């Protein structure tokens, strides 16, 4: 069928560890610093809303975290007067300076120490 595909081989990946990470006692300043240092580069677009952190959005869909409205930007009601606010949001700014999921997340590559090696296949 001549279907093109890529094999994505990785030597390791990170575990966000949402069931074992507990930053619930951290103050607002420390949570903002954690979010800032995380450098998680993606946002999610779902149901007409942009989410500050795609992992927080995934966790909400999976039932591991609550969905928090002020961590999103609603594009369904967007008008040009909100252009600056949208640009700031896309650059990683939100009202709190972090997302609630940070309290359960070990962070992205720059700060995450939970490195996971892939399993090796044994020959038959």
Question: Which residue ranges define each predicted feature?
Answer:
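Short cysteine/histidine-rich metal-coordination sites, predominantly Zn2+-binding motifs
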Residues: 116-124
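A C-terminal junction/extension of Radical SAM enzymes
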Residues: 1-57
């Amino acid at each position: 069928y001549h279907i093109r595909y890529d094999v994505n081989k990785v030597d390791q990946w990170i575990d966000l560890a949402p069931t074992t990470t507990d930053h619930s006692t951290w103050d607002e300043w420390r949570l903002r610093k954690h979010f800032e240092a995380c450098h998680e580069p993606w946002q999610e677009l779902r149901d007409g809303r942009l989410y500050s952190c795609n992992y927080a959005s995934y966790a909400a869909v999976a039932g591991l975290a609550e969905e928090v409205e002020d961590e999103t930007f609603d594009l369904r009601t967007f008008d040009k007067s909100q252009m600056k606010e949208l640009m700031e949001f896309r650059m990683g700014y939100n009202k709190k300076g972090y997302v609630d999921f940070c309290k359960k997340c070990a962070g992205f590559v720059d700060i995450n120490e939970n490195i996971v090696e892939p399993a090796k296949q044994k020959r038959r």
